[in-house]
Regions:
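Conserved donor-binding/catalytic core segment of Leloir-type glycosyltransferases
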Residues: 202-219, 224-228, 236-239
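Carbohydrate-associated surface elements
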Residues: 174, 189-195, 201, 278
Length: 372
């Protein structure tokens, strides 16, 4: 039997990544070792942004997380995502040296690569290893989120990645539309979650909705403002990082409306208790083709915390008794009332099936079924 290694390239810092529980499940269900390739350190970006810990971790070398799970912070001259072909040839040599410190005879292995950014197959081809590619598409990367316009650079990388990959995992059915020539190797996976132990003393915020996660320009500010204004009887709580281009908006609604409060940034470990605090989780995104293809992880995480959600219509989820869709202020208002008055029945078949089919354990099995 051919020896195999899983190589997972993270799209976010490992400790804060939405999918780190998935990667842990993959390692537990695999016979060989799994190497997590964290966001790289380099001479320029890491130092310019004050990310000195990245350089330190790259120098320290790989870290064993479990028996067969290894976290590697690679070191590059310049991050591969923004490097030209010449620089990336050197970057590839540096990466291969780092991998060989973990597995000396890595040339004898088949490497199954799970990755999230279309640049990686072309880059990893430079390693000259026995590599199979598995592409996980999170959003409609061919479009920009805030205005839905085509992004030519990402479109080019995405097409190359789709062509080179042995299998392609999709966040939603909508992502099939621009990739129909690859139907034979497409599978809709979506986000997952895990059951958590919650603090017993989580204090509920009565008559409340929560906007949780990265507060960015995906939000339909006009719709949300009118909803806040219409529902003065509802407490609107924001939890998460505020991106710079949303700071002015947040300052405005916090100053203007007494029913709005910002609770600050919280760690990934703390966020699950915040899902429990609110009656409903709100996803008031802009409505365009990009957004329609999304599957926000906050929805599945909130359902696992037994808190229902109301969102704009998206193809990443099916509407049900605890996930409601709304397009207008009136519809959002109505669905909030419905969900506050109709709590999730955690004993129902509908809920239990959702938990089973959306667990990270189940998602890991779906992915590994396609690894050759």
């Amino acid at each position: 039997m051919e020896k195999k290694i899983n190589l997972i390239i993270t799209p976010q810092e490992y400790n804060q990544a939405n999918h780190n529980e998935l990667w842990n499940e993959i390692s537990e269900k695999s016979d060989g070792i799994t190497i997590i390739l964290n966001i790289g350190a380099d001479f320029f970006i890491s130092l310019a942004r004050g990310k000195f810990y990245r350089v330190k971790e790259a120098i320290n070398g790989p870290k064993i997380l479990k028996n067969n799970l290894i976290l590697l912070r690679p070191f590059y001259i310049l991050r591969p995502e923004i490097s030209n072909n010449m620089v990336n040839r050197f970057n590839a040599k540096l990466l291969k040296q780092s991998l060989k410190k973990i597995v000396k005879n890595i040339e004898e292995y088949q490497i199954n690569v799970l990755y999230y950014d279309g640049i990686w197959p072309t880059f990893l081809d430079e390693l000259k290893l026995n590599t199979k590619y598995y592409y996980y598409i999170m959003d409609e990367v061919r479009n920009d989120a805030h205005n839905n316009k085509t992004n030519l650079k990402r479109t080019r990388h995405d097409k190359i990645a789709c062509e080179k990959s042995d299998y392609i995992y999709l966040m939603s059915t909508k992502l099939i539309d621009k990739r129909r020539e690859y139907l034979h190797k497409l599978k809709v996976i979506g986000n997952g979650a895990s059951q958590k132990e919650y603090d017993l003393n989580v204090e509920k915020l009565n008559n409340s909705v929560g906007i949780i996660g990265n507060i960015r320009n995906w939000v339909d500010c006009d719709l949300l403002t009118r909803l806040i204004e219409k529902r003065q009887d509802i407490h609107f709580g924001f939890v998460g990082n505020i991106e710079s281009d949303m700071q002015e908006y947040m300052d405005g609604i916090l100053t203007t409306y007494k029913n709005v409060k910002y609770y600050g940034k919280v760690s990934k470990g703390e966020v699950h208790n915040w899902y429990k605090k609110f009656d409903v989780i709100l996803v008031p995104y802009k409505q365009n083709e990009f957004m329609k293809a999304t599957r926000p992880i906050k929805i599945v995480e909130s359902i696992f915390a037994s808190t229902p959600a109301v969102s704009i219509p998206i193809t990443g989820y099916e509407e049900c008794s605890f996930i409601r869709f709304a397009k207008t202020v009136k519809e959002f208002s109505s669905e909030i009332d419905y969900l506050i008055n109709n709590k999730i029945n955690i004993e129902s078949r509908e809920y239990q099936d959702f938990i089973k089919l959306n667990s990270w354990s189940y998602k890991a099995e779906e992915i590994l079924n396609e690894f050759k």
